[in-house]
């Protein structure tokens, strides 16, 4: 009987600990969804990338600003959320629907929406959102500028198949290189200075 009471007490203590003290548990689910997103983006290839080499351009993805070492967890979440929203916005257009296989495009958008839902849940759990918003103005603005350059490029190239292919490859590269930022979501506040 004493064992049951002590077990019950342990459960009460564990279940009554504040949720806000727990880190947002996204890394495993985000990594799986990120891999699926990259797989779908790869499957969306319609033109051999080498045939579009003359159309290449540097959209200047702000890797230095997004390396993750500069941000606490809430800020990394906020910047990653902006990046996902921009990708959804880019691919959720009539012109995008005309350029891509709609089944793959729907899978891509569904996966991105799921990641956004996960990040929104995480942001809701985190404290200091006002502080994080102030700290991410520069990186968030850099992400917005990156996507603005992509949109201008597509407009200049009249949404050609090669232009979309160049954008698809660059989105894959930038999404893949955001791993450091996503890795920040798995670190506790005490780990912020860790490499």
Swiss-Prot record:
Claim: NAD is one of the keywords in the record: no
GO biological process terms held by the UniProt record:
adaptive immune response; B cell activation involved in immune response; defense response to virus; humoral immune response; natural killer cell activation involved in immune response; response to exogenous dsRNA; T cell activation involved in immune response; type I interferon-mediated signaling pathway
Pfam families for this protein: Interferon
User: Which coarse location class describes where this protein primarily resides?
Assistant: secreted
UniProt keywords, alphabetically: Antiviral defense, Cytokine, Disulfide bond, Glycoprotein, Secreted, Signal
Localisation per UniProt entry: Secreted
What is the annotated signal peptide range for this record?
Answer: 1-23
A Gene Ontology cellular-component term:
extracellular space
Q: Which domain of life is it from?
A: Eukaryota
Q: Which PROSITE patterns match?
A: INTERFERON_A_B_D (PS00252)
Query: Annotated Gene Ontology MF terms?
Result: cytokine activity; type I interferon receptor binding
Disulfide connectivity for this sequence is 24-122, 52-162
Q: Which SMART domains match?
A: IFabd (SM00076)
Sites carrying sugar chains? 101
Instruction: Name the protein family.
Output: Belongs to the alpha/beta interferon family.
PANTHER family annotated for this entry?
INTERFERON OMEGA-1, TYPE I INTERFERON
Query: What protein name applies here?
Result: Interferon omega-1
Q: Which organism is it from?
A: Equus caballus (Horse)
